[in-house]
């Protein structure tokens, strides 16, 4: 009788362990994706966007066009391109060294955002510096997605190494960055 009870207990424990082993671990968050937000460091994404092949190609083409205009004596075209490039550089500085919005970079990713959101299990993306937007989401509903967005820009290896420094650095306050940029010190 004692043997039967021990055998019954052993079989019961084994069956319980086997059923438990076949259950998938629940790593999935309990919050539905629509209620979760993917947060990203806009400075890092802006840097990746700047160094992406299409952006570097565009910059080379604009510089070549400026050079051609200058050589042809077309001062108006040269001045317009120079102003455009200056504004682009200023915008980039405010995005990379501070917390300015990165609308152009996110627009480039627009077609991929639904797939990236599904991959991350989030309903939307918000800059980690956008405190007003983040107030709508509790801490446990925030998912870090910076690296997920950055990988879309397919950075060259030297630029990838620079990203870690940006992640650790504290951004300049936007007003201070604007002042430094206007003074040519950013």
Model-derived features: positions:
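Positively charged n-region of N-terminal signal peptides that target proteins for export
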Residues: 1-4
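Amphipathic, charged alpha-helical segments and their helix-to-coil junctions
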Residues: 21-186
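Bacterial N-terminal signal peptides
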Residues: 7-15
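Sec/Tat signal peptide C-region and signal peptidase I cleavage site
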Residues: 16-20
């Amino acid at each position: 009788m004692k043997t039967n009870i021990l055998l019954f207990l052993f079989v019961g424990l084994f069956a319980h362990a086997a059923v438990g082993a076949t259950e998938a671990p629940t790593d999935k968050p309990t919050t539905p994706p629509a209620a979760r937000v993917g947060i990203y460091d806009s400075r890092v994404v802006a840097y990746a966007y700047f160094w992406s092949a299409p952006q570097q190609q565009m910059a080379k083409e604009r510089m070549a066009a400026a050079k051609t205009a200058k050589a042809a004596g077309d001062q108006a075209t040269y001045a317009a391109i120079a102003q455009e490039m200056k504004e682009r550089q200023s915008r980039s500085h405010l995005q990379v060294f501070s917390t300015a919005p990165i609308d152009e970079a996110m627009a480039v990713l627009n077609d991929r955002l639904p797939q990236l959101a599904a991959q991350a299990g989030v309903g939307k993306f918000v800059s980690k510096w956008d405190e007003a937007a983040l107030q709508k989401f509790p801490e446990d509903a925030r998912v870090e997605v910076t690296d997920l967005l950055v990988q879309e820009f397919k950075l060259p290896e030297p630029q990838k190494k620079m990203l870690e420094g940006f992640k650790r650095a504290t951004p300049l306050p936007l007003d201070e960055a604007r002042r430094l940029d206007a003074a040519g010190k950013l």
